[in-house]
Amino acid sequence: MSVSVNINNVTKEYRIYRNNKERIKDALIPKNKNNTFFALDDVSITAHEGDVIGLVGINGSGKSTLSNMIGGSISPTSGNIERNGEVSVIAINAGLNGRLTGVENIEFKMLCMGFKRKEIKQLMPQVIEFSELGEFIHQPVKNYSSGMRAKLGFSINVTINPDILVIDEALSVGDQTFTQKCLDKIYEFKEANKTIFFVSHNIRQVREFCTKIAWIEGGKLKEYGDLEEVLPKYEQFLKDFKKKSKADQKAFRKGLDEKRFIVK
């Protein structure tokens, strides 16, 4: 299978300011030193056609930062990401404008993706039918529940038939019937040899669905490999982590975060 996504030594840094004075000083003095947070640090992953890669890790590890970078909404500070094909990101609120109705969001998002109005008109009924939103499709998205927003976002993205699909916790909300319908659609994409990045805390879904695992911990790629090789290690880590007291869990997270801050 040919390479669909190549993530090369990607790092994402954020300057941390305690107040506006520090922010202004940093802007005026290029070599000014300040606290820098590494959301991701030197991550490299190669994905091929047909790969379904589970991005796993505890909250705050950097999974969503990586998924947004794959989708193109965030640029790396260093390194690069090569994508061979159209990419769609499915996340709660991803690409949705709360002031627009469901229909208007469909039109707007598809126009941004390069679809012509005639094509949008042809695809619109499919999106609406898949979403199961009924008359709510004509209401402003700001009035939607998180589950309804996820339904709309998922429906748009699967209808446009992307080559590379990034799913960031979008199946963690909504009813079970719709979630199963989404999973069935994702299986179709898997059978069509599309590349899928699947961000989820649902280990059962990850085990059922993914072929490879990228374990992100403290902004670094701890392990990347076949599902059978990496997932058991991550599951054991979760078991051990959950046995810790709340104080020990907090200390563990704090230890990881401290390593991600440097002055530069």
Swiss-Prot record:
Keywords: ATP-binding, Cell membrane, Membrane, Nucleotide-binding, Translocase, Transport. Transmembrane segments: none annotated. Residues 24-243 form the ABC transporter domain. It is found in: Cell membrane. One of its GO terms (cellular component) is plasma membrane. Its EC number is 7.5.2.4. The complex is composed of two ATP-binding proteins (TagH) and two transmembrane proteins (TagG). PANTHER family: TEICHOIC ACIDS EXPORT ATP-BINDING PROTEIN TAGH (PTHR46743:SF2). Part of the ABC transporter complex TagGH involved in teichoic acids export. Responsible for energy coupling to the transport system. This is Teichoic acids export ATP-binding protein TagH.
